[in-house]
Amino acid sequence: REPLAIVQAVSEYLPYLLGLYDCLLRDTILLRDDVHLTWRSMLVSSKFRLHGLLSEVCLMHMLYACSLRAEAATIVEALGAYELGAHDRKACDDRLRVAIDLLCRASGVCEYVATQLLPTYPAPPSKSAYPPELVSEGVQACSKLAMADAHALAIRKLLVPYARHHGPPLPPQHPSPSLLAKLQLHTASLFLEAHTLGAQSLGMEPHSAKHKLAQKLHSLLPATDLGGKMAFLPY
């Protein structure tokens, strides 16, 4: 399905799910049996048998966040090369702002799962017992990766007006090189943190060979029903 359709469906479903979960916490509703569900991870090609309504609450938030990232990637892909002339570029600016906003929202949703929901979730006997979407390091990696994508896209958008300028001196309105360096370093640090946390969530050594980590991360493609557009954005 299209990512936007999934975003809309989850947006409609989450309020009911959260209302039911709140009623369970307040004991205004009692379940005769525990909730059981089978989940196919969006990050690894495995199925997991889970129980408890909190599992579904966490996973629906993660599905929402991943779909937001997928929709952002779809928008960027549809724009193609947007280092264009001033007239043509204006038509792309609004779409780029939407994509950046979606990435920031995805990062915030993942951060909410990591800081507000997972601390109350039962600790796994091993990291392989739960999908990466229910492991704190994996969720934090998704949050930082989405934020890094947003930063990288915003930097590219910032530099688009000057893409056709060659040679010194810089145009009068060009962003400060020192500011750009700080932004790039911060973005790179977010990507590095995401890779390290992602490796930890998969039981890998964060300082293992770079090509092994890159190969493993490349294998974490989203489910085919999202069109494979949830991976790194093209910069």
Language-model region placement:
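Extended alpha-helical scaffold/coiled-coil
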Residues: 1-235
